[in-house]
Amino acid sequence: MLTVTDLSIRTKQTKETLVRSVSFSVKSGEALGLIGESGSGKSMTSKCIMRLLNPRLFDLRGSVKWNGKEMLAVKLNELDGYRGKQISMIPQNPMTAFAPMLKLGKQMELGFPLKGRRERTQFRGRLAAALADVNLPDAEKIINSYPHELSGGTLQRVMIA
């Protein structure tokens, strides 16, 4: 469960408050969409939850708890078991999340150390099933595409898979 309590984000340089006293919780199995006007702090809040804000540039106040653990106090080198495995974020512009010169299948393989043809084949099977789960049934086409060949919505679904 994710619990955000009285979260405020301020720049250290200009002292500008970017997010003021945001609180919400999300239970296991629930999805959350942050919606609001441009500049209202949606992306900053998401980046804070994912610990993607440079602590030298921002003052963070409040609490971000994941399953009871205070995430703002966790050391950055301990976040590997958290980001992507337990909690994820889909950016507004998915084009910025992919390397433009690599096919999507290759980029997805980079996250998993695959040894040999057998593991690669098994991975491709799991990947095809995950893509089908997000209504992308033509896995071979997706795997062999470059990011610029697909729509933003399709790329967002690839990220979810």
Positions of PLM-derived features:
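Conserved ABC transporter NBD signature motif
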Residues: 58-70
